[in-house]
């Protein structure tokens, strides 16, 4: 559409690449399941598209034994929060002394950006919920915090629910 409007010399199509990363289970931040490998794969993404199971099927086992979309979404979110909290706390412990003494300006800037993130994560809130200055956002980009990435939830419903997804109680709970 834009190429037709502006007639550029070259048209580069937009690309949205999805990578299916299996393996995040409760305890992943402590190395369970694919654990750290899984988390490292997510760090490389620009956004997270979380597909949440909202259908019943006895032929497809659920890792927790039952379908509960809210529980499953919260499990993933908590694992991402735990992983980020570990990253942030490790970094704070390395720079805190220099930052508080005021001898290192960069350490102070980093500390001032990380401290509110740590507080939010400790309360179970994602890093993206913290208001930061433009400078702080640039500074934190290097940490590749998982909960700072945009999150899109996709309800995986049965084919029978496609025409009227509101009949699916898990979908309704998730939306």
Predicted regions: what is each one?
Residues 94-175:
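C-terminal-of-GTPase-core extension/linker across diverse P-loop GTPases
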Residues 1-50, 55-70, 74, 132-143, ...:
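Switch II of P-loop NTPase G domains
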Residues 27, 60, 79, 91, ...:
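Active-site-proximal flexible loops/turns
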Residues 36-40, 86, 112:
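A generic "alpha-helical surface" signal
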Residues 17, 46-53, 69-95, 113-125, ...:
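Conserved beta-strand/loop subsegment of P-loop NTPase cores
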């Amino acid at each position: 559409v834009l190429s037709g409007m502006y007639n550029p010399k070259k048209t580069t199509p937009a690309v949205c690449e999805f990578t299916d990363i299996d393996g995040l289970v409760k305890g992943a931040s402590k190395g369970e399941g694919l654990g750290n490998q899984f988390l490292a794969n997510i760090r490389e993404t620009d956004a997270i598209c979380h597909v949440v199971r909202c259908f019943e099927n006895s032929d497809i086992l659920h890792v927790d034994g039952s379908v509960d979309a809210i529980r499953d979404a919260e499990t993933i979110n908590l694992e991402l929060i735990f992983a980020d909290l570990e990253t942030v706390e490790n970094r704070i412990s390395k720079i805190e002394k220099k930052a508080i003494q005021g001898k290192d300006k960069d350490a102070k800037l980093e500390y001032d950006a990380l401290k509110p993130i740590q507080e939010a994560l400790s309360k179970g809130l994602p890093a993206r919920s913290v208001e930061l200055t433009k400078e702080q956002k640039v500074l934190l980009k290097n940490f590749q915090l998982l909960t700072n990435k945009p999150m899109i939830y996709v309800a995986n419903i049965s084919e029978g629910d496609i025409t009227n997804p509101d009949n699916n109680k898990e979908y309704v709970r998730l939306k």
